[in-house]
Amino acid sequence: VCRRTGRLTAPRPIRTAPYPGFPTDAQAILMAALLRCRGAAVFEENLFSSRYRHVDELARMGADIRVSGRTAVVLGVERLHGAAVRCTDLRGGAALCAAALAAEGETAISDITHIDRGYQSIEDDLAALGADIRRVEETASP
């Protein structure tokens, strides 16, 4: 594992497609990786109509993402900040985790049962790589 400093340059447009094209399942996590890129990263979701549910939550962390229909444009920002966000699905949850690792301050992700469906003990794996992360049990409101 290595950590590279600096900002990535936005790639050419990313268009999801059936195999052997770019997998729709990787779209959210790649979007999170490009939140701080130089320039604009364009995503075109060609397989599912509701694959951008994580965008509003990423915006709470300072991401600049514009969605129009099946297209999302990520305008890279200098920094992300911690926020209280809600996981809406498995892949979006992974994207929130990735963005939280790059954000300044603390991020609290709720509804993590979505993440648990696909990533068993993700907090242990990320902590083993050096992340400052812990699981906190949610308490029910009276």
Predicted regions and their residues:
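Short, structured segments at the rim of ligand-binding sites
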Residues: 1-142
